[in-house]
Amino acid sequence: MEVTFFGTSAGLPTKERNTQAIALNLEPYSNSIWLFDVGEGTQHQILHHAIKLGKVTHIFITHMHGDHIFGLPGLLSSRSFQGGEQKPLTLVGPKGIKAYVEMSMNLSESHLNYPITYIEIDDHLTYHHDGFTVEAHLLNHGIPSYGYRVMAPETTGTINVEALKNIGLEPGPKYQEVKSHDTFEHNGQVYQSKDFRGESKQGPVVAIFGDTKPCSNERVISRDADVMVHEATYIDGEKHLANNYHHSHIEDVFALIKEANVKRTLITHLSNRYNTEDINEIYQTLIQNEDTPNFNFVKDFDSFKI
């Protein structure tokens, strides 16, 4: 799996950063791309990358603020002409996302050549697709804002070839049955497949947050995550300024990393008050502290393997 950032600014774009958009490549589990938020200009950002809109099967919106959704109508329209013809799309988001899209399409007389399934979240959501489980939980941002916990499928353990040979089963097509089924039959006897496989491995967990001030659901979403994507609109100064506007301060994120046992954190949604030089200087200062957890300030077009 791989996460790519097409927009990392907060509120407004800058000369260096677009508004919010994240792509999650599900390979090798699925040949699909999921988008999280579609800020203004997202489709233009995607043109500079190998990702194709036709491979986007799901879009998850964290909340209805403009820097997270103003690029959605244009991207949906372009998908009709960029490999998305007749390919269904699932759009998940807060209440109102369906009305927003349909009104935009109707008023602009735009017509899509593929179906959209809308899933509007109330308080929380559990969604299953292609072996993935996605949980959405409400955050604290003044308007409904959600964080998504994406859990990849479990990977089946490696076939124990010697154990299978011991029962007279030589390598061949039957091995695929052992790998993919709970039981298999050989020479008239039924065997439990798990007795001939190594331990299964849980797939990675990715936590992707919408805008929020600290709240209890953050720990539910990020618990033991392999990768967490979190906003830090304020990366210096007083914490109360961030919380007054229902946003997170860098110190809030660091506390969450430690409480939730997060392995790696990618910090986005940086205020446009910070330029690249500011961000680099603040990063160097922060990592001098031995208590600083593992994190990166991300920039547009950064990609990270999961």
From Swiss-Prot:
The cofactors required by this protein are: Zn(2+)
Give a GO molecular function annotation for the protein: 3'-tRNA processing endoribonuclease activity
Database matches in InterPro entries? RibonucZ/Hydroxyglut_hydro, RNase_Z/BN, tRNase_Z_dom
**Swiss-Prot/TrEMBL catalytic activity:** Endonucleolytic cleavage of RNA, removing extra 3' nucleotides from tRNA precursor, generating 3' termini of tRNAs. A 3'-hydroxy group is left at the tRNA terminus and a 5'-phosphoryl group is left at the trailer molecule
**One of the Pfam families matching this protein, by short name:** Lactamase_B_4
Residues the record lists as binding Zn(2+) 2: D67, H68, D211, H269
Q: Is Membrane there in the keyword field?
A: no
- What Gene3D superfamilies does this protein map onto? Ribonuclease Z/Hydroxyacylglutathione hydrolase-like
Stated family? Belongs to the RNase Z family.
* Known role: Zinc phosphodiesterase, which displays some tRNA 3'-processing endonuclease activity. Probably involved in tRNA maturation, by removing a 3'-trailer from precursor tRNA.
Name of the protein in question:
Ribonuclease Z
Originating species: Staphylococcus aureus (strain NCTC 8325 / PS 47)
Q: What is the lineage of its organism?
A: Bacteria, Bacillati, Bacillota, Bacilli, Bacillales
